[in-house]
Curated annotation (Swiss-Prot):
This is Glutamine--tRNA ligase. GO terms for cellular component: cytosol. Belongs to the class-I aminoacyl-tRNA synthetase family. ATP binds at residues 35-37, 41-47, 231, 261-262, 269-271. A motif ('HIGH' region) lies at residues 34-44. PANTHER family: GLUTAMATE--TRNA LIGASE, GLUTAMINE-TRNA LIGASE. Keywords: Aminoacyl-tRNA synthetase, ATP-binding, Cytoplasm, Ligase, Nucleotide-binding, Protein biosynthesis.
Amino acid sequence: MSEAEARPSNFIRQIIDEDLASGKHTSVHTRFPPEPNGYLHIGHAKSICLNFGIAEDYQGQCNLRFDDTNPVKEDVEFVESIKRDVEWLGFTWSGDVRYSSDYFDQLYQYAVELINKGLAYVDELTPEQMREYRGTLTAPGKNSPYRDRSVEENLVLFEKMRAGGFAEGTACLRAKIDMASPFIVMRDPVLYRIKFAEHHQSGNKWCIYPMYDFTHCISDALEGITHSLCTLEFQDNRRLYDWVLDNISIDCHPRQYEFSRLNLEYTIMSKRKLNQLVTEKVVEGWDDPRMPTISGLRRRGYTAASIREFCRRIGVTKQDNNVEMMSLESCIRDDLNEHAPRAMAVLDPIKVVIENRAAGEEWLTMPNHPNNPEMGSRQVPFDSEIYIDRADFREEANKQYKRLVLGKEVRLRNAYVIKAERVEKDAEGNVTTLYCSYDAETLNKDPADGRKVKGVIHWVSVAHALPAEIRLYDRLFNVPNPAAAEDFLSTINPESLVIRQGFVEPSLADAVSDKTYQFEREGYFCADSRYSRPGALVFNRTVGLRDTWAAKATQ
């Protein structure tokens, strides 16, 4: 991460400052503990920036630990993608990658300790019965008939669970806390369940797997985590976090702190719903550029710096709030406006023939960035036949239209002034070719007679233009809060992807996916990492030059 990125201030950092000042802790140790059951999204980026950013700023450590306690939903594919995402965002974890499964032997022994203390029991209620016994927010639960088994019987039954002596769903290990607790999470929560599934790390060694709430706190303690940072939905779980650590023989007792999760407009963060988009082929995959996944944003052309800046701007609080999509888009625009080289691309081409110019190429020098000479320049060919965008020509127009009009002039970007003389149309009345004249004395300068030419349009040489598929990506949903809809799929934006067949200038022949360009007057684009290759270019629109949704919202 760049040292130039400002160090933020928030309530968590204030707590850390107080802990260090009081001597409660002499160093800071955080962790990022994703479950490897899907791809990380922009909400995870907030947690990554918080945990790794704190470790960096306080010269501490941050572990990457996979919460891999459910072998049915997890996959090595997700493990590898998460590691790539963390590294791409610019962070380095401390030591080796860790897995909760590394601690399965110790977790089992801690479960046995709770049984020996009379604080855990093997329950044989069915899942349906367990839900019924749990009670509701307004009604207390009731004790399982298996709750008062002896320590000896529970030890035998728990070992039987481990040995595969029970079928899935017929037995589990539960903590013995309080079925009348006002907090449902404390009503004898399940600590271990049976799953006959091969684990991507431990293989077939285990057929019982610890639950998240039991695993999380013990893993934190075993790793010496000082500040365990979670989103607000785990606030009630902190009671169970503390209960487990208070009742086992372990020296370290980390403290859990909660912050608000990221709610971003015009998208969804639910991993289940994101998976539904993928499995029902609403999108191409987890890295579809319309997805809020880090891999999707990366493929779309977002930079790691822009995502870090977004996380810095939205901050860390305890209050839930909805963040406008324009806040994220503003971060990438600011970044790319400063760093993206310029190029010309015509998305909806119309051919222009310059009749008073002899055929033959002329190579024009153009800056790669108008405000940064250090980015150098490039050579762009100009010829007597060029493409311009269809939207940049009208046969008739009012004075507010500053582009090319029949009988009037416009300037070609970094080139000459041209005048529209006549048009050629097809049988349907569509303009197919525009015939123009040019002023040979106006290369990057005003006409000698002082006449004013106000408009500037982009172009590419027909003889040198490279065909390209241009994918115009937009927001995936057409309402700010699709998660609130009865059927979130009904709010899909039908224009979230529009494909154009256009032309780009020859300097983009070898465009690579990790480099984003400003297509002048069109927006920011990058070569698609999956499909683009020399001779078959595919460009994804990262973001437009300005926010068009704000205008739509006021209409």
